[in-house]
UniProtKB/Swiss-Prot annotation:
Recorded metabolic or biological pathway in which this protein acts: Amino-acid biosynthesis; L-proline biosynthesis; L-glutamate 5-semialdehyde from L-glutamate: step 1/2
PANTHER family linked: GLUTAMATE 5-KINASE, ISOPENTENYL PHOSPHATE KINASE
EC number: 2.7.2.11
InterPro entries for the chain: AceGlu_kinase-like_sf (IPR036393), Asp/Glu/Uridylate_kinase (IPR001048), G5K_ProB (IPR041739), Glu/AcGlu_kinase (IPR001057), Glu_5kinase (IPR011529), Glu_5kinase/COase_Synthase (IPR005715), Glutamate_5-kinase_CS (IPR019797)
Disulfide bonds: none
A cellular component annotation (GO) from this entry: cytosol
Protein encoded by which gene: proB
Catalytic EC class: transferase
Subcellular location: Cytoplasm
GO molecular function: ATP binding; glutamate 5-kinase activity
SUPFAM superfamilies: Carbamate kinase-like
Protein name: Glutamate 5-kinase
Primary role: Catalyzes the transfer of a phosphate group to glutamate to form L-glutamate 5-phosphate.
Amino acid sequence: MGMMKRQFEDVTRIVIKIGTSSLVLPTGKINLEKIDQLAFVISSLMNKGKEVILVSSGAMGFGLDILKMEKRPTNLAKQQAVSSVGQVAMMSLYSQIFAHYQTNVSQILLTRDVVVFPESLANVTNAFESLISLGIVPIVNENDAVSVDEMDHATKFGDNDRLSAVVAGITKADLLIMLSDIDGLFDKNPTIYEDAQLRSHVAVITQEIIASAGGAGSKFGTGGMLSKIQSAQMVFENKGQMVLMNGANPRDILRVLEGQPLGTWFKQIEEVTHD
């Protein structure tokens, strides 16, 4: 079977997910260059008539920077306080930098219960549609200050990989672009095996792929590759498509949309029916 060519000409609505590791430098300082490039790319896409929703982590990282804390607190209430401070700082910076490119942004903070209850789901769907129709970029994050992860009342999404897949589903996005600190999905862990090969296209998520995504405890673990595979499964359930790519250079998003084979493209093959 020949390689399927990536056709993104018809893609109008795009969800882009960026993680903390892309926004915060190893020193704990904010990666201003990255945020500026991302704002430029999204604004360029908006100017071309695309609709873009940004799912952004980073509240904790921004909060630690502002409060001059060396490491993430272990206490949940403190974590929530740090995230609460960081969320405002992050949105303030996004707002300023997007303004350079004449793009307006808004904030949507979600918890899982919002998308579980039909009434609140309808409301948040309408909010997205309304913002998009006004030419505004919704910036989405989990509402860390109120999210809880307890058995009887779980309102956390788990992480923003899953949140981005949920948002792509809610908004019926044509494409989810997940920016990561790795180049895509490999056939085995590239940090261990030098001969690991990047998978260019994944049409079916097999048990083998889930296994090769690695266990917890590595950057391929929780919030790592496994959650990205689970997100791809959600995208498939919603009949969508996803590209997992390295976020080192946000301008690569423009190259991906031109059909260049960067990262891993998750797209089911349409069933061809014969009479």
